[in-house]
């Protein structure tokens, strides 16, 4: 087959339609968004909530968001940079931290709706799939997973946040195919492997491996862990304490900001008319006083 170079004609450029700016920036998948926010026409003024998870280089953002004509409304949010308040000071962007962030958001939104006692979720994370069961009084809080434009591969951190929200008591439609530990061959989830990821076992295993093979790399790669005194054997207990602390008090903590410093003023303050007038009178008095002293000296001579 002969290779034919595709030429873009005038008709192509005439009919070319530029995509939305946020799609060009790689921020919003409008094809997925329109399917996530479309509400049934017989549900009047009923918001459709999304469980939004986004990752930055140093943080994890989890939000419960509903769409409106005026714009998206954030009902509740949780961030990985809040986890140091619960005892997790290192590794704020891995799979285990994503689980903690999802758990924090779930407990926070249920506490806000006064449903935290009714829907406790899965208190002990075993790695097995969990779905909340509705009670007789109130239905569980339902949200749809919004992953944005990331690649939904098996074991992605976004599914760690999903697992945390599920164990926290939220009702999110899902499948266990993308959790860490799912085997493609036998199409089953290995709960032990998934539990290992939830409690940071993959991190502790790598720390042990580096400690045996490359101690120098361990000092540089896990310098923050070593500085904080976090050892490979204590990581699982650390995450268990963090989960318990999140369930005990998921409310957001108010940060106390220091008072602004009083900077030294280098430019002269603008004087009012009365201040200028008084200053002039003082200068005249000072000059008159100096002139009177000179006259006295002349008389003495």
Curated annotation (Swiss-Prot):
UniProt record, GO biological process: adaxial/abaxial pattern specification; cell division; leaf morphogenesis; nucleocytoplasmic transport; root morphogenesis; translation
Superkingdom, natural source: Eukaryota
Any one of the GO CC terms: vacuole
Organs and tissues of expression: Expressed in seedlings, roots, stems, leaves, inflorescences and siliques.
Subcellular location: Cytoplasm; Nucleus; Nucleus, Nucleolus; Nucleus, Nucleoplasm
Effects seen without this gene: Moderate reduction in cell number. Slightly pointed leaves and prominent marginal serrations. Delayed leaf growth and abnormal leaf patterning, with the abaxial mesophyll features appearing in the adaxial mesophyll domain. More proximal vein branching in the petiole and reduced number of small veins at later leaf developmental stages. Abnormal inflorescences terminating early and producing several secondary inflorescences. Double mutant ae6-1 as2-101 exhibits an increased number of lotus- and needle-like leaves, rough adaxial surface of expanded leaves.
Molecular functions (GO terms): 5S rRNA binding; mRNA binding; structural constituent of ribosome
InterPro entries linked: Rbsml_uL18_euk (IPR005485), Ribosomal_uL18_C_euk (IPR025607)
UniProt keyword Manganese present: no
Keywords, alphabetical: Cytoplasm, Developmental protein, Nucleus, Ribonucleoprotein, Ribosomal protein, RNA-binding, rRNA-binding
Pfam families: Ribosomal_L18_c, Ribosomal_L5e
Record function comment: Component of the ribosome, a large ribonucleoprotein complex responsible for the synthesis of proteins in the cell. The small ribosomal subunit (SSU) binds messenger RNAs (mRNAs) and translates the encoded message by selecting cognate aminoacyl-transfer RNA (tRNA) molecules. The large subunit (LSU) contains the ribosomal catalytic site termed the peptidyl transferase center (PTC), which catalyzes the formation of peptide bonds, thereby polymerizing the amino acids delivered by tRNAs into a polypeptide chain.
Protein family (similarity comment): Belongs to the universal ribosomal protein uL18 family.
Subunit structure: Component of the large ribosomal subunit (LSU).
Name of the molecule in the record: Large ribosomal subunit protein uL18z
Name of the encoding gene: RPL5A
């Amino acid at each position: 087959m002969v290779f034919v170079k595709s030429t873009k004609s005038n008709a192509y450029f005439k009919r070319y339609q530029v995509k939305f700016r946020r799609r060009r920036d790689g921020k919003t998948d409008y094809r997925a968004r329109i399917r996530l926010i479309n509400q049934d026409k017989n549900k009047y003024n009923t918001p459709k909530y999304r469980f939004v998870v986004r990752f930055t280089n140093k943080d994890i953002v989890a939000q419960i968001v509903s769409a409106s004509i005026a714009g998206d409304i954030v009902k509740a949010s949780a961030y990985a940079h809040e986890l140091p308040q619960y005892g997790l000071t290192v590794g704020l962007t891995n799979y285990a931290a994503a689980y903690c962030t999802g758990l924090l958001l779930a407990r926070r939104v249920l506490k806000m709706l006064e449903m935290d006692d009714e829907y406790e979720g899965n208190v002990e994370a075993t790695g097995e799939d969990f779905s909340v069961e509705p009670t007789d009084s109130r239905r569980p809080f339902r949200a749809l997973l919004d992953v944005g434009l990331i690649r939904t591969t098996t074991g992605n951190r976004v599914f760690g946040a999903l697992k945390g929200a599920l164990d926290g008591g939220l009702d999110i439609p899902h499948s266990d195919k993308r959790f860490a530990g799912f085997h493609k061959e036998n199409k089953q989830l290995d709960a032990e492997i998934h539990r290992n990821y939830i409690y940071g076992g993959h991190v502790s295993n790598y720390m042990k491996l580096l400690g045996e093979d490359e101690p120098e790399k361990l000092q540089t790669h896990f310098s923050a862990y070593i500085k904080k005194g976090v050892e490979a054997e204590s990581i699982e207990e650390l995450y268990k304490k963090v989960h318990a602390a999140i369930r005990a008090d998921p409310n957001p903590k108010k940060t106390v900001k220091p008072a602004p410093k009083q900077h030294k003023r280098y430019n002269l303050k603008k004087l009012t008319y009365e201040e200028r007038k008084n200053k002039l009178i003082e200068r005249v008095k000072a000059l008159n006083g100096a002139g009177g002293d000179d006259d006295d000296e002349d008389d003495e001579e």
